[in-house]
Amino acid sequence: QFRRGLRPVRNLAAEAARAQSEGDELCCLRVSGSYAEADFSGLDFDRVLFENCRFTKCSFNGCSFHTAAFADSDISNCDFGEARFIGCVFHGAKGVGTAFTGSRFEKTRFGSCGMSYANFGRCRMVKCRLDASDFSDASFSEAEFREPALRESVFVRTDFFRTPLRGIDFTTCRLEGLTLSETASELRGAVVGAGQAIELAKMFGLIVR
């Protein structure tokens, strides 16, 4: 249903250049193709489907995405700093080392994504879902979560420094080797299972019998 009424685009760079020169938004597009070191910064994307795309070191800095979807696309090492995502979906997306620093996510879902080494530092996530995705070695330093839903996702060596995790249910997720402050105050009020609690206790030199 999302695909209905979308215009196929195989040259996003040309569409972006036109939109930037005219101060227009990019709306109702179905984007495909490969793009390297392209500058899409500051653009507004409304109801745009990025399907089977490959972006290499591209800049989406300061972009706004409304009801957009990244499906089976590779956005590794791209810059989405200070971007805004509202009602968006990342499904089967690969974002290794991608920078989302200072971005805002509202009612956005990550499903079956590979986001290892991605930087979500200082980002804000409101009513977002992180489903069956890998955030190993990713950074959520000084981030903010409001009413998140986490399911079967991986957080191995993930950085949550100065990010309150109170009320977040990690029971179906994998937690190992987290980066926290010395007091681990970030974990206060977080919901974890018994096995996870034992693993977390090891981080502080505790021996659980």
Model-derived segments and their meaning:
Residues 2-209:
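Tandem repeat scaffolds
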